[in-house]
A protein has these predicted regions:
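Class I SAM-dependent methyltransferase SAM/SAH-binding core
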Residues: 98-140
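A short acidic, Gly/Pro-enriched loop at the edge of an enzyme's catalytic core
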Residues: 143-152
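Residues lining the SAM
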Residues: 153-157
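A short glycine-rich, Lys/Arg-flanked "PGG" loop and its adjoining helix->strand segment in the class I
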Residues: 166-181
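SAM-dependent methyltransferase
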Residues: 184-267
Length: 301
């Protein structure tokens, strides 16, 4: 009762601050990720490249990067800007745990997801058993027949993990039907926010806006371990390393290092044009709070 009486005496401004504080506490409580079922046997593990995408990473991946509002925004914009019909057939490159495939499928569209990681494909099948996922390398021209798709999507940094983008763009040109669309997620390497979503509970407000220097680290406390990551951009050779560390409660440690080929927006767009694509549109993802990130829409003539 004393609290209620005291609260009633507060100004409207102070009441708003109290509610915001309680709201932030609730966000932090409910957004603390939970994961079960994995036990690392070795005291120390170091993984690089494709080896990273194993059972643990496929299990934890959604907790680190999944954002349903962003995914909905992207798919809605893609459908609106490219147009779809009964004859539309989608391929989602780097489909991961399957969420973009599921959203497209829910719209009644034919869609296949492809990923190099068998663990990620297995997780996608578990998440969405009615959707189609295959394990394969998109740098292999023979993985699909010519003219198989009307749309190819390459979402959430997938383009940056490819060591031969020229081959990828040439393959997409072959796999697309005439008039088909290639949609690629691209970022401004110098300005996008590398903090993972759980590391920024509010999400709608970027910490970068108020930081004197770019924040490149993320730290998240899980039930079983503490997760940290850091994004290191090398402007000299247009690459970046994404370093991750899992420190388990039992003292065991797992480290990971991923290499990204982080050329500028213009360079990658020109590579697509060199393969014969025409840039038709750009979707700015600031509309879903992903600043300096875009969907470039190319078409095959």
């Amino acid at each position: 009762m004393k609290f209620i009486k005291g609260f009633d005496k507060l100004s409207n401004y102070c009441k708003i601050l109290v509610f915001l504080s309680l709201f932030l506490v609730l966000i932090l409580i409910f957004k603390t990720p939970k994961r079960e079922g994995y036990e690392q046997l070795e005291k120390y593990v170091m993984k690089k490249g494709d080896d990273i995408y194993d059972e643990l990473y496929s299990d934890i991946y959604d907790l680190l990067v999944y954002n349903d509002l962003k995914n909905d925004y992207e798919i809605t914009k893609i459908v609106d800007k490219t147009g779809v019909g009964n004859d539309s057939v989608f391929l989602d490159v780097g489909s991961g745990t399957g969420h973009h495939v599921k959203l497209l499928s829910d719209k009644g569209l034919k869609v296949t997801g492809i990923d190099k990681s068998s663990a990620m494909v297995k997780k996608a099948h578990t998440n969405f058993p009615d959707c189609k996922f295959v394990t394969g390398d998109v740098l292999n021209t023979d993985v699909f027949n010519n003219g198989s798709f009307t749309h190819i999507t390459c979402m959430y940094f997938s383009i940056y993990y490819l060591h031969d983008r020229h081959q990828f763009f040439n393959n997409c040109m072959e796999w697309l039907k005439p008039g088909g669309f290639l949609i690629v997620h691209l970022v401004n390497p110098d300005k996008f926010d590398p903090i993972l979503p759980p590391g920024n509970p509010l999400q709608i407000v970027s910490a970068q806006k108020y930081a004197k220097e770019r924040i490149t680290t993320t730290k998240i406390t899980f039930n079983e371990f503490v997760y940290t990551s850091n994004f290191n951009l090398n402007k000299q050779n247009n690459t970046a390393t994404f370093e991750e560390k899992f420190k388990f409660n039992n003292g065991k440690i797992r480290k990971q290092e991923q290499l990204l080929h982080m050329d500028s927006l213009e360079v990658i767009a020109n590579e697509a044009k060199d393969a014969g694509f025409v840039l038709r549109n750009k979707i700015n993802l600031v509309g879903c709070a992903y600043v300096f990130q875009y969907l470039y829409i190319f078409s095959r003539e």
